[in-house]
Every structure is written in structure tokens, then in C-alpha cells.
UniProtKB/Swiss-Prot annotation:
It comes from Prochlorococcus marinus (strain SARG / CCMP1375 / SS120). One of its GO terms (molecular function) is rRNA binding. SUPFAM superfamilies: Ribosomal protein L20 (SSF74731). Coiled coil: none annotated. The keyword rRNA-binding applies. This is Large ribosomal subunit protein bL20. Binds directly to 23S ribosomal RNA and is necessary for the in vitro assembly process of the 50S ribosomal subunit. It is not involved in the protein synthesizing functions of that subunit. Signal peptide: none annotated. Belongs to the bacterial ribosomal protein bL20 family. Keywords: Ribonucleoprotein, Ribosomal protein, RNA-binding, rRNA-binding. It comes from the Bacteria.
């Protein structure tokens, strides 16, 4: 059986992990074993939090819309239900932006929906 030398491949694999771990504190950024563990955990967290970010922003938009709607005498659920009945297609992100940046137009939207 012939001998297999993996020096180049192994070094590249380790250096790839160490490049990903650049900036980590202490041995987590310089020793391969600990860096590998930290990088794996960081990638898992990044994957999880990319999914979580979508949920978090939706919750934030709903909270903002609810606060603005209640200032105009309507609950969030009634506002969204009436928007659907009136066939007004504004998504929650846009509604939250309107509520914060342009309260007068948000009042008009609520007034249109109340009819």
C-alpha cells in the first residue's frame, strides 16, 4: 500500500478554520481544536439567529403597530382584520414604518379602516 501524505490538505483545512476564528479571544482564535469548537458554535448560532431575526422583527412591527393603533382608538387585531376586509394590502413592516415616521397618514389609514 502506498503512503498518503496529507500535509497540504490538512494545513489548508486548519488554516480555513483559523481564518474563520480570527478575532476570537485567547486560544479560541489561535489553537485549532478550541478554534474549531468555537467556529462550529458560532456557525450554529448564526444559522439559528438568521431564522430568529425574522420572528423578532415581526414581533417588533406588531408591537409598534399595536401602540400606534391604540393611540388612535383601535386594537391591533381589529385594525388588521379591518384592513383585510377593506382589501388594503399593506404589510406589517410598511405599517410600522408609517406609524413611526408619518403618524398623520397612519391616522388616515385607521380612519379609512374604521368606516
Amino acid at each position: 500500500m502506498s503512503r498518503v501524505k496529507r500535509g497540504n490538505v490538512a494545513r489548508k483545512r486548519r488554516n480555513k478554520i483559523l481564518r474563520l476564528a480570527k478575532g476570537f479571544q485567547g486560544s479560541n482564535g489561535s489553537l485549532f481544536r478550541t478554534a474549531n469548537q468555537r467556529v462550529m458554535k458560532a456557525l450554529c448560532n448564526a444559522y439559528r439567529d438568521r431564522k430568529r431575526r425574522k420572528r423578532d422583527f415581526r414581533r417588533l412591527w406588531i408591537a409598534r403597530i399595536n401602540a400606534a393603533a391604540r393611540m388612535n382608538g383601535m386594537s391591533y387585531s381589529k385594525l388588521i382584520g379591518n384592513l383585510k376586509k377593506a382589501d388594503i394590502r399593506i404589510n406589517r413592516k410598511m405599517l410600522a414604518q408609517i406609524a413611526i415616521l408619518d403618524p398623520t397618514n397612519f391616522q388616515k389609514v385607521v380612519a379609512d379602516v374604521k368606516k
